């Protein structure tokens, strides 16, 4: 059980970085890899972070960074399509990476905020 305590401590000490890493980890459950146990681990870690968040603002930030990691890594195929004409469209790759994760991260942030409001005692 020593590794479990270390994992909980790591998640609690770096909540935003942990949420970003868990969001990137959850992408492994998508095609072509289908590693579904990693999705369970990612959502379990997200729930731990949300229940440990001291305020709704922190829960919103944790949800946002989870969504940023999930969508920025999960929508890599858009960046891959931009690489077909790299000299002309290459400048769009960082904007697409940050923009897709930044915008779609809000779709995970608001449910995380509501989860914080409705958590039990």
Which sequence ranges carry the predicted segments?
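Membrane-embedded alpha-helical bundles of multi-pass enzymes
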Residues: 2-121
């Amino acid at each position: 059980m020593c590794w479990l305590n270390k994992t909980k401590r790591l998640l609690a000490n770096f909540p935003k970085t942990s949420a970003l890493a868990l969001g990137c980890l959850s992408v492994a459950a998508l095609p072509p890899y289908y590693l579904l146990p990693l999705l369970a681990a990612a959502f379990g870690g997200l729930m731990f972070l949300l229940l440990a968040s001291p305020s709704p603002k922190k829960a919103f930030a944790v949800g946002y960074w989870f969504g940023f990691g999930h969508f920025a890594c999960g929508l890599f195929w858009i960046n891959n399509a931009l690489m077909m004409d790299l000299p002309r469209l290459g400048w769009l790759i960082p904007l697409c990476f940050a923009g897709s994760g930044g915008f779609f991260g809000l779709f995970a942030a608001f449910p995380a905020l509501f989860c914080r409001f409705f958590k039990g005692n």
